[in-house]
């Protein structure tokens, strides 16, 4: 335990921020999983409704990733890398098998 009042306060703030960041990272991971599930459902049975669901899930994941970057939960490059990977998965799925 910290002996100095300011150090104790910083420890308290760090713990608060850690929990907040943990919740944000969890939300990002959940939305990415939802997107990947939508992609797998679309790949097994490609219909326009499922494609719309895939795009909707992608938009939700992108939004949450961008907000996490803006709040400092994720590094800018990490957010860009995750978005690029999600886009690459979508493009690979939509590409006709050649």
From Swiss-Prot:
It holds the Pfam family Ribosomal_S20p. GO terms for cellular component: cytosol; small ribosomal subunit. GO terms for biological process: translation. InterPro entries: Ribosomal_bS20, Ribosomal_bS20_sf. Belongs to the bacterial ribosomal protein bS20 family. GO terms for molecular function: small ribosomal subunit rRNA binding; structural constituent of ribosome. It comes from Thermosynechococcus vestitus (strain NIES-2133 / IAM M-273 / BP-1). PANTHER family: 30S RIBOSOMAL PROTEIN S20, SMALL RIBOSOMAL SUBUNIT PROTEIN BS20C. The keyword Ribonucleoprotein applies. It comes from the Bacteria. Keywords: Ribonucleoprotein, Ribosomal protein, RNA-binding, rRNA-binding. Binds directly to 16S ribosomal RNA. This is Small ribosomal subunit protein bS20. The keyword Ribosomal protein applies.
């Amino acid at each position: 335990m910290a002996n100095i009042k300011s150090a104790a306060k910083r420890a308290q703030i760090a713990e608060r921020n850690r929990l907040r960041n943990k919740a944000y990272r969890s939300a990002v991971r959940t939305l990415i999983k939802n997107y990947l599930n939508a992609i797998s459902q679309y790949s097994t049975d490609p219909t326009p409704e499922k494609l719309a669901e895939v795009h909707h899930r992608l938009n939700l994941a992108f939004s949450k990733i961008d907000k996490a970057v803006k709040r400092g939960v994720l590094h800018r490059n990490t957010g860009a890398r995750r978005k690029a990977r999600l886009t690459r998965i979508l493009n690979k799925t939509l590409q006709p098998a050649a």
